[in-house]
Amino acid sequence: MRKILVTNALPYANGDLHLGHMLGYIQSDIWVRFQKLQGNQCIFVCGSDTHGTPIMLKAKSLGITPEELVTKYSNRHLQDFTDFEINFDNYHSTHNSLNKEIVEDIYNKLNNKNLISKKAIAQAYDPEAKMFLPDRFVKGTCPKCKAEDQYGDSCEVCGATYDPTELINPRSVISGQSPIQKNSEHFFFDLPALEKNIKDWIESNTLLQPEVANKLAEWFEQGLQSWDISRDAPYFGFAIPGTNEQKFFYVWLDAPMGYIASFKDYCNKNNINFGDFWGDSSSESELYHFIGKDIIYFHALFWPAILSSTGYKTPTSVFANGFLTVNGKKMSKSRGTFIQARTYLDNLEPSYLRYYFASRLTSRIDDIDLNLEEFVTKSNSDIVGKVVNIASRCAGFIYKKFDATLSGEIFDPELESEFSKNHDAITQAFEKREFAHAVRLIMALADKANQFIDYHKPWQLAKEEGQEQKVHQVCSQGINMFKVLIAYLKPIIPSIVAETERFLNIQFISWADAPKFLINHKIDKFKPLATRIEKEKVDKILEDTKKMFENEQAPQSKKEEPKLDIAAECTFDDFMKVDLRIAKITEASHVEGADKLLKLILDLGGVTKQVFAGIKSAYKPEDLIGKHTIMVANLAPRKMKFGMSEGMVLAAGDGKGIYILEPHEGAQPGMRVK
């Protein structure tokens, strides 16, 4: 039995949760439920992130205390999580005495190791509001990539971190005025001194996502900087000892320690030994942090450095998820797609969204698009039309004609074996967080089950004399195949599974038992387990969202939507002159003397081509080998000083990143793209 501790990023307690938040929490909840079904001791903790200037100022504007504000939103968050079937073992808060003790203890350990220093810095100060401005209360143009409207600590476009003083055309979010520079003594954590610790952690981390590893390599190349861990009063948070409450710990120092506090609180309540899960590096337990891709910097640099230097076990891995778009675009209040968790729950069951997200989630850091039309179609087709429909087609015969008892014989052992054989592949897919692949495997089995029922037509057999035994066996096999499918789906749609357990008079408590058929087993009367989503309900979610935000006043003038610079039109015949082929990357290597190029050897199904691709900044050669991509196969060879380039691989980019195109699973080298 494995000992596994899982955390999820702490939601900030100054506003309601939206569906973009739920993407990450649903992902981790599915994985945790799977681990528990495997029989592992898996503990899942979270809590509210409750400190910082945004909370202080919002509470002031509402005429309440910060404590009242965070209590209000913490309760609302927990209710949203509960109703979305996110099953935390403990939900805590960063604003409590336990977390304060942990923060001060870790700070003192860092200070005793001379990893904390003080220095005067020029800081943004709002002369109108008469206060120093936290990083997130200064906005301007990113000094690295020149993206506009970025926060004062990091860029959401390129991921760069910087000081607010480096922003181009900065402005105060509070007053809109240009901040002035004012000196203040701050406390710094010596991150560069722990570079080896971080690199050792990365090298030992076999589960780190390639995108995270690439980003870390980029940050190392830029050079690590000491981290400002303090903020000036007024501030809602924990005061730094010895500063007479004039300096406070930066929220990003005490927030991750909320993971420790939440788990310690769980241990205290349940008589668990904290060290068994989160002791030192010698512990055999596993520790995983599920986070959004926008906070990789804090979790994959600062956090391992702090833990490794204060005697705590470092994460076994950090798993990041992408952002959520709706109908192919960024979530929008005006379009009604900035959907809050509660707005969804007021109109639809959580199972549908949990299933849709699972059908899209992989181990990669890909953004997920919630296409609402596809969401309706997929939910109705897969959950209702494929899975639940199996039970509804068979249960009535068993209940009415055969005393609600399943057959003692298996009608089609070969088909039963196929459902069992897929167990290992589905298990591996769940373990590796390849939920989309797991769903595809499960739905392929659902198709086979429906084909079986369509072929034997029990509703016709029931009308024929002497076919009672066959009807019994066919419908029993149908119910058993349904049972296996539902057992496989338990981590994804737990509430539908709970209703199924009532219907089947069984509890799915062991993943190993998932593929086992029930023999001579008594079932209950079937009741509908899921109903089709009506488009009107989705429309109502959009309308409710629009109404919620229609009176909001935008603090700044509305920006124009970005326009695509589409190339001149070409004819179909022109397009067909370009021969696009599926290619497998069999070799990839650096090109000596080239800053941007990688040398690729591509297999087109028996034919190989050599290509020099300008993707070095985005990919390591070893990460590309074995991938499938798309290439222009009939591009005239081009002689370069490094050798002959015999084509071009396709990649997308916006000037800030490069992303090679990968075909859908099943595409083979040499296939033409049309």
Curated annotation (Swiss-Prot):
Location of the tRNA-binding domain: 574-674
SUPFAM superfamilies xref list: Anticodon-binding domain of a subclass of class I aminoacyl-tRNA synthetases (SSF47323), Methionyl-tRNA synthetase (MetRS), Zn-domain (SSF57770), Nucleic acid-binding proteins (SSF50249), Nucleotidylyl transferase (SSF52374)
Chain sites annotated for binding ATP: 333
Pfam families reported in the protein's UniProt record: tRNA-synt_1g, tRNA_bind
Cofactor details (free text): Binds 1 zinc ion per subunit.
Keywords in alphabetical order: Aminoacyl-tRNA synthetase, ATP-binding, Cytoplasm, Ligase, Metal-binding, Nucleotide-binding, Protein biosynthesis, RNA-binding, tRNA-binding, Zinc
Cofactors demanded by this protein: Zn(2+)
Subunit architecture: Homodimer.
Protein name: Methionine--tRNA ligase
Gene name of this polypeptide: metG
